[in-house]
């Protein structure tokens, strides 16, 4: 029996999609506020990927991850995301350390290019999660 909190995962995915929409709606990140907003959006996208990955791993009793990269490796191994998507998302996840621990070194231009370069994988991530949930658990029901 799986203990997957679909409601929590769906809230996280909705928040993720909102952050991605905010990224897409902005055309100028050059101001100081713009750069800080971009860094926050990038950080939140990464956290949503990791939180959703951990929720999937815990809920479906997959093997325990040993690192952030390993979360993506497990999602690839379990066929939640494709290998290409996993590799692309890992490139963005690798920037987490800079955003969280080495924030003085954060380069908004580099982060912008990373998000743009892997935007398809980012857009597909919620679809892949939802598809896997429906395949494994069936359609969402109004009853809990």
Swiss-Prot record:
UniProt key word 4Fe-4S: no
Chain location of the short sequence motif RX(4)HXY motif per the record: 96-103
A GO cellular component entry from the record: toxin-antitoxin complex
This protein's UniProt keywords: Hydrolase, Nuclease, Toxin-antitoxin system
A molecular function GO annotation: RNA nuclease activity
EC class: hydrolase
Gene3D superfamilies (alphabetical): bsu32300-like
E.C. designation(s): 3.1.-.-
Active site: 96
Keyword Hydrolase included in the entry's annotation: yes
Physiological role: Probable toxic component of a putative type VII toxin-antitoxin (TA) system, probably an RNase. Probably neutralized by cognate antitoxin YutD.
Family matches, as PANTHER family: RNASE YUTE-RELATED, UPF0331 PROTEIN YUTE
Subunit structure: Homodimer, probably forms a complex with cognate antitoxin YutD.
The family this protein is said to belong to: Belongs to the HepT RNase toxin family.
Full protein name: Putative RNase YutE
Organism: Bacillus subtilis (strain 168)
């Amino acid at each position: 029996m799986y203990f997957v909190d679909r409601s929590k995962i769906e809230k996280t995915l909705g928040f993720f999609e909102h952050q991605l929409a905010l990224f897409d709606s902005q055309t100028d990140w050059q101001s100081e506020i713009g750069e800080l907003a971009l860094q926050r959006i990038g950080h939140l996208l990464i956290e949503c990927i990791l939180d959703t990955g951990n929720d999937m791993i815990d809920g479906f009793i997959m093997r325990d991850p040993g690192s952030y990269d390993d979360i993506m490796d497990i999602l690839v191994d379990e066929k939640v995301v494709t290998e290409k998507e996993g590799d692309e998302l890992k490139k963005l996840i690798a920037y987490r350390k800079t955003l969280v621990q080495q924030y003085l070194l954060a380069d908004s231009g580099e982060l912008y290019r990373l998000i743009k370069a892997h935007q398809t994988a980012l857009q597909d991530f919620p679809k892949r999660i939802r598809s896997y949930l429906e395949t494994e658990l069936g359609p969402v029901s109004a009853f809990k």
